[in-house]
Amino acid sequence: MHDLWPTILLGIIEGLSEFLPISSTGHLLVAEHWLGERSETFNIFIQLGAVLAVCLIYKERLSSFLFLWKDREKLPYFLKLSVAFIITSILGLWVKKMGWELPKDLGPVIIAIFGGAFWIYFTEKVSSQRQSFVEEISWPTAIAVGASQVVAGVLPGFSRSAATILMAVLLGVSRPAATEFAFLLGIPTMFAASLFAWIEETHFLKNPSLDSPLTLATGFCVSAVVAFISVKWLLSYIQTHTFIPFVWYRVGLGFFLIALVALGWKTQ
């Protein structure tokens, strides 16, 4: 059981930070510094655990997409999700083809954390001037949200949730509607990204993970449970609150990471 504590803690951190607009990357970097770096396969499993939580929360919405031929009113929403995902996929593959790689030090992550804080603050200030918000996702909004996922992907620390949710809010969508669209879009996006990363990691299944099945299962389950709780909380919170508190949390996280760098900590 003692050997599983690092796995449990990393699962908790992933579950808390994956869908909140606070950046899972920044938190996992710090955690893995003290708990030990984990394999890409382990990271994929805890991310999939978080995705499963969102699937369970939106199970009715997702199941309704299986019967679009019965309920045509949901077809436009499904098509907008599909187009947003396609845009994310095309732009993501283009960025990958250009040779982009994840940064190997904390500098770019810290910049992205502060950049995400500014993005949230700016969007909330602009949206505070609006007299009303819309509940429907327009085609321009769907396209913009799909593109914004790529920004979060190339700037680890920015936060996919912060990029997508706040993009929709900036374009006049209510926080609950923006969050739902962003989370539903995140399901196929994160599944696809996890599959792509897994294939790369295993070199087409020729180099299997050294993690034990117990380790992978524990990380997956812990992440799923914690993500379920945190997403449920967020969906309730945004009914009556703004995202401004996350700005100050991110600023605090950014300065904490700066302090670590000043003390000589490196990720390599």
UniProtKB/Swiss-Prot annotation:
Where does it reside?
Cell inner membrane
UniProt entry keywords in alphabetical sequence: Antibiotic resistance, Cell inner membrane, Cell membrane, Cell shape, Cell wall biogenesis/degradation, Hydrolase, Membrane, Peptidoglycan synthesis, Transmembrane, Transmembrane helix
- Could you tell me the EC number(s) of this protein? 3.6.1.27
Q: Which GO terms describe its cellular component?
A: plasma membrane
**Disulphide-bridged cysteine pairs:** none
Task: Mention one GO molecular function.
Answer: undecaprenyl-diphosphatase activity
Name the NCBIfam families for this protein: PRK00281.1-4
- What is the purpose of this protein? Catalyzes the dephosphorylation of undecaprenyl diphosphate (UPP). Confers resistance to bacitracin.
Family per UniProt?
Belongs to the UppP family.
| Other noteworthy facts | Bacitracin is thought to be involved in the inhibition of peptidoglycan synthesis by sequestering undecaprenyl diphosphate, thereby reducing the pool of lipid carrier available.
Q: What is this protein called?
A: Undecaprenyl-diphosphatase
